[in-house]
């Protein structure tokens, strides 16, 4: 199981809407037995920027959403404190997405490696090399 970051969803939607088979679609197709999830935070970010509301919600349907729980909040607070102490802050939404992945014990697939690699213990994957 893996969690897909908002950056991945945006690239996947662009490929899908253009009928292209790019890096994001190839990544999903490389192992059909792999399960993919998204954070409710990624759903929020994606839908906020999506033009046709109904279409955006339909686009996200194949990806079960992981909730922000008390456990996620605890992990996020530790991540935030650590990054602030290092002077290496990332956005609060990215912190919540990272905390969701850490709590679930799964890697995150993203195009935003620079931010997520700052989070200790988080396994970060890119789809661009596929």
Feature roles, as predicted:
Residues 9-10, 44-47, 117, 125:
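Nucleotide phosphate-binding site architecture
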Residues 5-6, 46, 76, 101, ...:
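Generic structural signal for small/hydrophobic residues in well-ordered secondary structure
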Residues 1-38, 47-61, 130:
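Short, well-structured N-terminal submotif of metal-dependent ribonuclease cores
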Residues 1, 98, 102-130:
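Acidic, PIN/NYN-like endoribonuclease modules and their adjacent C-terminal/linker elements
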Residues 8, 42, 72, 97, ...:
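Alpha-helix capping/helix-boundary segments
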Residues 19, 65-111:
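Active-site neighborhoods of divalent-metal-dependent phosphate/nucleic-acid chemistry enzymes
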Residues 39, 43, 53-56, 73-76, ...:
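A general structural signal for well-ordered alpha-helical segments in protein cores
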